[in-house]
């Protein structure tokens, strides 16, 4: 009987479970829709929709499997941390961290908050594997090579390189302005080149090295990848954050020493480029002549030799590691000329449209013959009425535009069609490299979040730290070299940290303090904190100077600089009815006592002067500016009285002698002490 009762209860229990699950189907669908938007869901949110006490474990596992197949991650609710500004940073098991918006347990509603939208979109980008990083790095390299190859076909590039070579020889510019010094030197070290040139060069480490110069070749290669803290001899943890600039200054070689080692090799490469391009220019002329004459005189062997020489020049230019600013200048020059050509093309097309020439027909007849001197004669001989109208009504305008195009062709040194092809190749390479860099940056944005949150409460807001870290990330993408073997995240970490710490040093304080002084302040603060624990009180400047082996005057100067500014609106007193600014003396304002003395002196002088003759009184008033806006010179007073300046001087001296008489002067001595 008991067994029968138990059997009777089983269907009811299953029915209850099925009913409970059926009632939650709408909530499950809503949960799946929200999770698809966010890309993840927490265990707590899953339990809120499907409580474990009412839903079986098998059903929960089925739902979790379904979520996994949809690409939705199920994460632990306890791992969600809320950071500054309301952003939530969810830490994963790897070295990177996933940033999401909102707080734990918050409903996943749509939002138009730009910060949350940024974090949501950032979290939707998949992380890159080592193979994915290499693939993108190769795409960046291929795009750059395509761009450089296009630049190497333009005579303007080699004109600029020749100018740079001459300026380097005459020392008008520095080597660091032409090439990427750290990348070139790092490549030389990897190939065991350039070390010979370093022998005998004593280059002091540059203190306060500029960020652009000191952030150098592969910082990750010189630093441990571990984030474990280091300890000093007393067992106290050493703050890496405060000492990063010190490490950079001590590990980076002097820029002058690098330039001295690389300059001979760079000049030699520039000479090779100039020599090879002289040959290439001759072959370009022959190739262009063969194309224009359509006689096929440029043989297959000559074309192969042309392509081989062109590839050699591209390799030489790539070895130089030209500075990005120089490459951008060359590209801007090409694009500027291309805009000029497009403007001329637009003018020609407008004239053709006005003459009712079919646009496609006109472009077919125009393109490729921009520099052909016989083009106008051939086109004007066409029997079509539209072409006749063009040259009857707009011949002078067409001639002017053709003349402008000829000037452009003479300047660029190649045929216009060839120049268009060069520009298209440069644009293609630039676009490919830019797209690959964008993908690399987007895939590592959450790495910036994970690093930036460790630097909060240091004077910059969290979003500002993210922004600065993103700038460092973009620089890391530009300088990353996958052939060195380390992962991009390891390499980018130090660039991001350096960008964030440098921005904190530059922007955190209301009054900017130089980076080298920030380092000294941090060192002083650390020592002061250590001595506070040792002696139980704040150390005196003398004790700090002795501990740091630093001059006392410098310690006092650093302590004075380290003081934070305070607001003039800071409340003063218990009732807080006054502000700090109310107690600051205005150096430009007249004190009430001085104002009273001046007014009394003015009244006394006014009573004394009438005892003189009217002429003497007026001369003194004009000479000393009494009762007037300004004083006057002897010449100006003489012109007023129509007498010489000598006569005015005599009248002034006589009047002053009269004022010294006791009958008049006894009223004035009391003002002499004021």
From Swiss-Prot:
<dbReference type="InterPro" id="IPR050239">
    <property type="entry name" value="Sigma-70_RNA_pol_init_factors"/>
</dbReference>
<dbReference type="Pfam" id="PF04542">
    <property type="entry name" value="Sigma70_r2"/>
</dbReference>
<dbReference type="InterPro" id="IPR009042">
    <property type="entry name" value="RNA_pol_sigma70_r1_2"/>
</dbReference>
<dbReference type="GO" id="GO:0003677">
    <property type="term" value="F:DNA binding"/>
</dbReference>
<dbReference type="InterPro" id="IPR028630">
    <property type="entry name" value="Sigma70_RpoD"/>
</dbReference>
<dbReference type="Pfam" id="PF04545">
    <property type="entry name" value="Sigma70_r4"/>
</dbReference>
<feature type="short sequence motif" description="Interaction with polymerase core subunit RpoC">
    <location>
        <begin position="464"/>
        <end position="467"/>
    </location>
</feature>
<dbReference type="InterPro" id="IPR036388">
    <property type="entry name" value="WH-like_DNA-bd_sf"/>
</dbReference>
<dbReference type="InterPro" id="IPR007631">
    <property type="entry name" value="RNA_pol_sigma_70_non-ess"/>
</dbReference>
<dbReference type="Pfam" id="PF04539">
    <property type="entry name" value="Sigma70_r3"/>
</dbReference>
<feature type="region of interest" description="Sigma-70 factor domain-2">
    <location>
        <begin position="440"/>
        <end position="510"/>
    </location>
</feature>
<dbReference type="InterPro" id="IPR012760">
    <property type="entry name" value="RNA_pol_sigma_RpoD_C"/>
</dbReference>
<dbReference type="Pfam" id="PF03979">
    <property type="entry name" value="Sigma70_r1_1"/>
</dbReference>
<dbReference type="InterPro" id="IPR013324">
    <property type="entry name" value="RNA_pol_sigma_r3/r4-like"/>
</dbReference>
<dbReference type="GO" id="GO:0016987">
    <property type="term" value="F:sigma factor activity"/>
</dbReference>
<comment type="function">
    <text>Sigma factors are initiation factors that promote the attachment of RNA polymerase to specific initiation sites and are then released. This sigma factor is the primary sigma factor during exponential growth.</text>
</comment>
<dbReference type="InterPro" id="IPR000943">
    <property type="entry name" value="RNA_pol_sigma70"/>
</dbReference>
<feature type="region of interest" description="Sigma-70 factor domain-4">
    <location>
        <begin position="608"/>
        <end position="661"/>
    </location>
</feature>
<protein>
    <recommendedName>
        <fullName>RNA polymerase sigma factor RpoD</fullName>
    </recommendedName>
</protein>
<keyword id="KW-0238">DNA-binding</keyword>
<dbReference type="InterPro" id="IPR007624">
    <property type="entry name" value="RNA_pol_sigma70_r3"/>
</dbReference>
<dbReference type="Pfam" id="PF04546">
    <property type="entry name" value="Sigma70_ner"/>
</dbReference>
<dbReference type="GO" id="GO:0006352">
    <property type="term" value="P:DNA-templated transcription initiation"/>
</dbReference>
<feature type="region of interest" description="Disordered">
    <location>
        <begin position="216"/>
        <end position="252"/>
    </location>
</feature>
<dbReference type="InterPro" id="IPR014284">
    <property type="entry name" value="RNA_pol_sigma-70_dom"/>
</dbReference>
<dbReference type="InterPro" id="IPR007627">
    <property type="entry name" value="RNA_pol_sigma70_r2"/>
</dbReference>
<dbReference type="InterPro" id="IPR007630">
    <property type="entry name" value="RNA_pol_sigma70_r4"/>
</dbReference>
<comment type="similarity">
    <text>Belongs to the sigma-70 factor family. RpoD/SigA subfamily.</text>
</comment>
<keyword id="KW-0804">Transcription</keyword>
<feature type="region of interest" description="Sigma-70 factor domain-3">
    <location>
        <begin position="519"/>
        <end position="595"/>
    </location>
</feature>
<keyword id="KW-0963">Cytoplasm</keyword>
<dbReference type="InterPro" id="IPR042189">
    <property type="entry name" value="RNA_pol_sigma_70_r1_1_sf"/>
</dbReference>
<comment type="subunit">
    <text>Interacts transiently with the RNA polymerase catalytic core.</text>
</comment>
<dbReference type="Pfam" id="PF00140">
    <property type="entry name" value="Sigma70_r1_2"/>
</dbReference>
<dbReference type="GO" id="GO:0005737">
    <property type="term" value="C:cytoplasm"/>
</dbReference>
<keyword id="KW-0731">Sigma factor</keyword>
<keyword id="KW-0805">Transcription regulation</keyword>
<dbReference type="InterPro" id="IPR013325">
    <property type="entry name" value="RNA_pol_sigma_r2"/>
</dbReference>
<dbReference type="InterPro" id="IPR007127">
    <property type="entry name" value="RNA_pol_sigma_70_r1_1"/>
</dbReference>
<feature type="DNA-binding region" description="H-T-H motif">
    <location>
        <begin position="634"/>
        <end position="653"/>
    </location>
</feature>
């Amino acid at each position: 009987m008991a067994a029968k009762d138990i059997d009777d209860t089983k269907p009811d229990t299953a029915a209850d479970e099925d009913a409970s699950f059926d009632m939650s189907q709408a909530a499950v669908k809503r949960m799946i829709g929200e999770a698809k938007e966010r890309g993840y869901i927490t265990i707590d949110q899953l339990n809120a929709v499907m409580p474990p006490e009412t839903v079986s474990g098998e059903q929960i596992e089925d739902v979790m499997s379904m979520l996994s197949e949809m690409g939705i991650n199920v994460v632990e609710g306890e791992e969600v941390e809320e950071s500054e500004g309301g952003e939530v940073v969810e830490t994963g098991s790897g070295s990177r961290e996933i940033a999401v918006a909102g707080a734990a347990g918050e409903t996943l509603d749509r939002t138009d908050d730009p910060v949350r939208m940024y974090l949501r979109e950032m979290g939707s980008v998949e992380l890159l594997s080592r193979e994915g990083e290499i693939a993108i790095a190769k795409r960046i390299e291929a795009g750059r090579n395509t761009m450089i190859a296009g630049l190497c076909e333009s005579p303007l590039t080699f004109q600029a390189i020749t100018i740079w070579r001459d300026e380097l020889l005459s020392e008008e510019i520095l080597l660091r302005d032409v090439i990427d010094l750290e990348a070139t030197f790092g490549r030389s070290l990897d190939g065991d080149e350039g070390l010979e040139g370093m022998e005998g060069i004593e280059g002091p480490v540059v203190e306060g090295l500029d960020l652009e110069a000191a952030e150098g070749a592969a910082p990750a290669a010189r630093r441990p990848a571990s984030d474990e803290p280091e300890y000093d001899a007393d067992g106290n943890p050493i703050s890496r954050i405060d000492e990063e600039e010190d490490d950079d200054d001590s590990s980076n070689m002097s820029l002058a020493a690098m330039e001295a080692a690389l300059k001979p090799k760079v000049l030699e490469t520039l000479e090779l480029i100039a020599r090879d391009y002289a040959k290439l220019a001759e072959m370009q002329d022959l190739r262009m002549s063969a194309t224009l004459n359509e006689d096929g005189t440029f043989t297959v062997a000559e074309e192969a030799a042309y392509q081989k020489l062109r590839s050699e020049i591209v390799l030489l230019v790539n070895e130089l590691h030209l500075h990005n600013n120089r490459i951008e200048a060359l590209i801007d020059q090409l694009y500027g000329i291309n805009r000029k050509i497009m403007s001329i093309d637009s003018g020609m097309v407008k004239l053709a449209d006005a003459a009712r020439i079919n646009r496609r027909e006109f472009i077919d007849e125009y393109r490729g013959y921009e520099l052909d001197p016989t083009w106008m004669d051939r086109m004007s001989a066409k029997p079509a009425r539209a072409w006749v109208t063009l040259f009857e009504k707009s011949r002078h305008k067409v001639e002017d535009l053709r003349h402008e195009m000829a000037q452009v062709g003479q300047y660029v040194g190649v045929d216009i069609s060839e120049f268009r092809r060069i520009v298209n190749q440069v644009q293609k390479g630039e676009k490919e490299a830019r797209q690959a860099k964008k993908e690399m940056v987007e895939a590592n944005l959450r790495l910036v979040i994970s690093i930036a949150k460790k630097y909060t409460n240091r004077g910059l807001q969290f979003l500002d730290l993210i922004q600065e870290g993103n700038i460092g990330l973009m620089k890391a993408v530009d300088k990353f070299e996958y052939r060195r073997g380390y992962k991009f995240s390891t390499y980018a970490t130090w660039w991001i940290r350096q960008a964030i710490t440098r921005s904190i040093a530059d922007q955190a304080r209301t009054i900017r303090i130089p980076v080298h002084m920030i380092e000294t302040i941090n060192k002083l603060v650390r020592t002061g904190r250590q001595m506070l624990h040792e002696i139980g009180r704040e150390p005196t400047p003398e004790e700090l100077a002795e501990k740091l082996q630093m001059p006392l005057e410098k310690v006092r100067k650093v302590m004075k600089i380290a003081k934070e500014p305070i607001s003039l609106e800071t409340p003063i007193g218990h009732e807080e009815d006054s502000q700090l600014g109310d107690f600051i003396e205005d150096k430009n304002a007249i004190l009430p006592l001085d104002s009273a003395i001046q007014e009394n002196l003015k009244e006394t002088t006014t009573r004394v002067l009438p005892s003189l003759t009217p002429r003497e009184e007026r001369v003194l008033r004009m000479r000393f500016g009494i009762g007037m806006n300004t004083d006057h010179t002897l010449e100006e007073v003489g012109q007023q009285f129509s007498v010489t300046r000598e006569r005015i001087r005599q009248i002034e001296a006589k009047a002053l002698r009269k004022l010294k008489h006791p009958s008049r002067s006894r009223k004035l001595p009391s003002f002499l002490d004021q």
